[in-house]
Each structure stands twice: as C-alpha cells, then as structure tokens.
Regions:
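Inter-lobe coupling/hinge segments of SF2-like helicase ATPases
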Residues: 47, 61, 65, 73-76, ...
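Upstream accessory/linker segments immediately N-terminal to the RecA-like ATPase cores of bacterial MutS
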Residues: 1-70
Length: 317
C-alpha cells in the first residue's frame, strides 16, 4: 500500500510468494479494467463540440509567442478529436517549456465556449497554483471563470468553490487529487486535462476511471512511463509529440563534474545575475541545512530556501 512501510516476511514461509501472487492477480484485474474502459470509450459516443468560435480565434491570436509547427499540429488534432463522435483520449508528450500548457488552455477554452466545464488535475499543490495563475492570466480577457482546489483552500472558501462548481458558475477548476474526492460535483463536465498522470497513486487512478468513461481526456507529460506510451502505441490512446522547441530557445546543457565549490559559486552567481533561479538538489535531509549554509557562504547575496518531504504544507508553501 502506498505511504506505508513494506512488511518484512519471515524466511522459510510462503508469505512472500502469496504476496506476489496476489499482486499479479491485482495487476491483471487493473489491466483488464483499463482495457474495458478504453474499449468502451472507443465504441461510445461523446459530446461533439462545435467548430471554433470567434472567441477561440481571438484567444489563439492573442498568444504572445509564435506557435511551433508541433504546437499547431497538436492543437489541430485535439480539435478534430473534440469535434468527433468518440470521447477524446489523447496523450501530448513534450519537453518542459515546449508549449503543452498553451495547448491545454486552448482545448479548455474550446470546451468552455460550448458550455462545458473543465477539470485540470495536477500532481502537486504548488503546480495547481502555478496552473491557476497561468490559466487565469491567459483567459482574463475572455468570459471564463477559473478557480482551484487544493489542501490550502479550506472552510468557507472551499465550500463556496464547491457550490459554484456544482451550480456551473466555475468553468475551469484546477486542483490536485482533491478533484476526484466525494464532495466534488460538476454541473456539466466535458473535458479532463491530466498533467503528468504517472505521478498519481493507484487510488486516484481508480477514481479517474469512473470520471473518464464519457468525458474527453487530454493527458500532458514530459516523461511518459512505458505503460502510458504502450496504451498510445496499441491504439487505446492517440498520441501527439511536441519536438520543435520555441523560437530562440537554447537547448538544455547538462554537465557532469566533480564536487567543486568554485564551480557551484560561479554557476549560482551567473544564474542570479541574469535574473534566474537555482534549484540545488541534495540527497540527505540530515545535513541539508549545512549545504544551504555553504551556498549562502559562497554567494552571500543569494536568498536561500530549503524544501524537503518532512516539511508540512504551510512551510513548503
């Protein structure tokens, strides 16, 4: 079970073999359920969206960057899926910064202009807030209400959001696994966008199966796991790949070097001087404060923060 320590079995017993057999049986059941779901979706009729409205055209024209060829191709494929009879189930693969979020925003707005609600499911609280700000800013000039749900929204604020969602006053809701909770009720859900589906646990995916049966689904990922790709390759899911980087984007440089304080100082100083941020990954919580102190000593002007899995939600935020 996720979130619990594995049980140690006594040697010379059949306990481990029994556990393996149960796991194999459960995996087969899940695989069969998924295949049934995808077969049902392929053979069922979903909502057929209307051709693009003038608002859709205005939204896409207001994009401040030039669309890449793969962005245009993926957007067109998604529109054809949404305007078709069968429920959409498309996987969009692309590196970070290659424009997947813009594609998702266009798909979401297309659903909204046909009076449908959109759920955007993300794996982390911080990402839900980032997406909320991005969607809200991008759609601020259009008739579209965007809101969010995560563990930081509680009390009256959460109750109000849930009521607005059920009444249909919210067009796009962005959230973590809380979006598949028992209290969530949609008036007219038409599109589900899932960001990095492989990062969700089994319990969330089981709930997703019931939601996805008759709803268009768009999955975004930068790192698809083999099973996700396999579903696309076998035809259960349609696949769009974004390979072309945005104009003037430099490729990511990866260097492997021995630990050296001068290299760390120079790299951090350079990034800060150009207005950027640095993500320094350390592999032990026990001495992470000492590492933060080292960075502060090397680059006195830097503002250094610490984040790890033993901090509570408020501290991380």
């Amino acid at each position: 079970k996720e979130g619990t320590a594995p049980k140690i079995h006594r040697l010379g017993t059949n306990a481990w073999q029994n556990t393996k057999n149960k796991t194999k049986t459960r995996v087969k059941e899940i695989a069969f359920d998924l295949l049934q779901l995808y077969a049902k979706r392929k053979n069922s009729k979903g909502f057929q969206y209307s051709p693009d409205t003038y608002l859709q055209t205005e939204l896409e024209a207001s994009f401040m960057y030039e669309d890449t060829p793969d962005q245009l191709t993926s957007t067109q494929a998604i529109k054809e899926d949404m305007e078709g009879e069968a429920p959409m189930d498309r996987l969009v693969c692309g590196d970070v910064g290659f424009g997947k979020t813009e594609i998702a925003i266009r798909a979401a707005f297309k659903a909204v202009t046909d009076s449908k609600q959109v759920a955007v499911l993300v794996p982390t609280t911080i990402l839900s807030l980032q997406h909320f700000k991005t969607f809200k800013e991008r759609l601020k000039e259009f008739p579209c209400k965007v809101s969010y749900i995560n563990r930081f929204k509680t009390g009256k604020s959460l109750t109000q959001t849930l009521k607005e969602l059920e009444d249909g006053d919210i067009d796009i809701i962005i959230g973590t696994h809380a979006l598949v909770g028992k209290r969530i009720k949609f008036k007219n859900l038409g599109l589900m966008i899932i960001d990095e589906e492989q990062k969700f646990g089994v319990a969330v995916k089981d709930k997703l199966k019931t939601l996805k049966a008759n709803v268009d689904t768009l999955t975004l990922t930068a790192t698809p796991i083999p099973r996700t790709l396999q579903f696309s390759l076998m035809g259960a899911r349609d696949l769009s790949i974004i390979n072309t980087p945005p104009p003037n984007r430099y490729p990511v440089e990866t260097e492997l070097r021995p630990f050296n304080e001068e290299v760390i100082r120079d790299a951090v100083s350079y990034e800060i001087s150009r207005g950027g941020q640095v993500y320094f990954v350390h592999n032990r919580i026990g001495n992470i404060k000492e590492v933060a102190g080292m960075i502060q000593r090397l680059v006195p002007d830097a503002r250094v923060g610490i984040g790890h899995g033993q901090l509570n939600g408020e501290q991380l935020e």
